[in-house]
Amino acid sequence: MDERAVAEWLDGYARAWGSYDPDEIGALFSQDAVYAYNPFDEPVRGREAIVASWLEDRDEPGTYEARYQPVLVAGDQAVAHGYSRYFDTNGTVADEYDNLFVLRFDASGRCASYREWYMQRPGEDDPA
């Protein structure tokens, strides 16, 4: 993998999140992929289980946006950073998260291992 390939994968990840199309989601991951929503929970195992997990708890279209970019690419592994924003019904930012992904890819460019760390940014009313 190189930086461009990882950036394209991340763009596909954001598109799949927006569409919730099972084929788009599945195309991102290897058959035996592991997907950890956070580093401390048991990961979801297998492409079909990952797709089902995504489809279980959908965000409403237009209520969020995301942007991610590679920070480091070394062989079949990558680290990416970005943000996810969620909006109120009036369009203002309700919540914002910084995200860090640790990724490993197979020879076909599909993600074989996904582990995410996320941290909510403090809001204007939150103590810094």
Label each residue range with its predicted role.
Residues 1-31, 125-128:
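Short, low-complexity N-terminal intrinsically disordered segments enriched in polar/charged residues
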Residues 2-5, 51-128:
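A beta-strand edge to alpha-helix "cap/lid" segment located at domain peripheries
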Residues 14, 39, 70-72:
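Structured beta->alpha junctions
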Residues 33-35, 85-86:
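Short beta-strand segments in beta-sandwich/barrel cores
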Residues 34-44, 57-59, 117:
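A short gly/proline-enriched turn/hairpin at secondary-structure junctions
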Residues 42-52:
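Short beta-edge strand/loop motif at the mouth of beta-sheet-based domains
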